[in-house]
Amino acid sequence: MSADQSSGDPLNDAAELPRVSVVIPAYNEESVIRQCLIAAIYQSVPAHEIIVVDNLSTDRTAAIVRQMQLEYPESPILLLSQDRDQGLIPTRNFGLDHATGDVLGRIDADSVVEPDWVEQVQRAFQDHSVQAATGPVVYYDMPMRRFGLKADDKMRQLMLKLAKHQYHFLFGSNMALRSTAWNTIRAETCRDEKDEMHEDIDLSLHLAEHDLKVQYVPQMVSGMSARRLEDSPRDYRYYVTRFDRTYKAHNVKKMALKAPMVVFFSVYFPAKLLRAIHTVNTAQPVRRGGQ
């Protein structure tokens, strides 16, 4: 049954919908974790579980999650601790390994998913050929959010065309994959102990090696912070060139895939200035969507 088809029997359709776990790796995220969890809680269709994996945080991240467990006892918020290794990849892996859903959503601690995010993920995975999915993001702490969402969507669709649909890249702030797909690639994913690569691109390339289909879903929208623009030019350059290092690790030489690097480099200074002006002139709470 495709994502657009229905059996006509509401009970059967509900039974076929996959259970969606939401996994959120977190390190010193006290400033954003509450808004992230509130967005994950208030969904048109509830998540099977919402897992925060605390990775040796030294701030109040874990305390805030525990407080929210008390405030929202009906919500399936789970707090796990990954204190063996510092880093996103071991923390991500720990969360995905412990998730019990049919589909494993993965977002960042600064993500603010749209109210129908879980529902859109379920719809996408009703197509049994889909093994992973990703969607566009809107930068909620930037001006012109509606334009930004459209631009992000267009850029990601352009990437698909440039890659001639050979590679469909996941975006770590807004992605999901089947538990079976994760189990297939789990042992092969790069540990990246030097922290040189984009872990979401690495996941995507391992999925491609097994011919596991990644679907781009424009309706699967998440907000995220543009806080990356706070990086120094040197740190930002290192972040952007992670694309190259990830491609090299997988012996991917398609020149068209360098397009995101060009885009990210070209927007850094104007976007950084725009965000600084916007931050000074506004004190609005986080809003969902391109509003």
Where are these regions (language model features)?
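Cell-envelope/extracellular polymer assembly enzymes that use nucleotide-activated donors
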Residues: 19-21, 49, 202
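A conserved acidic beta->alpha catalytic loop
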Residues: 39, 54-63, 84, 111
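Glycine-rich, basic loop-to-helix element that forms the pyrophosphate-binding segment
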Residues: 82-99
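Conserved donor NDP-sugar-binding/catalytic core segment of glycosyltransferases
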Residues: 116-146
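Short aromatic/hydrophobic "clamp" motif used to bind/position activated sugar donors
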Residues: 104
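Short, flexible, basic/aromatic active-site loop/helix in glycosyltransferases
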Residues: 135-139, 147-168
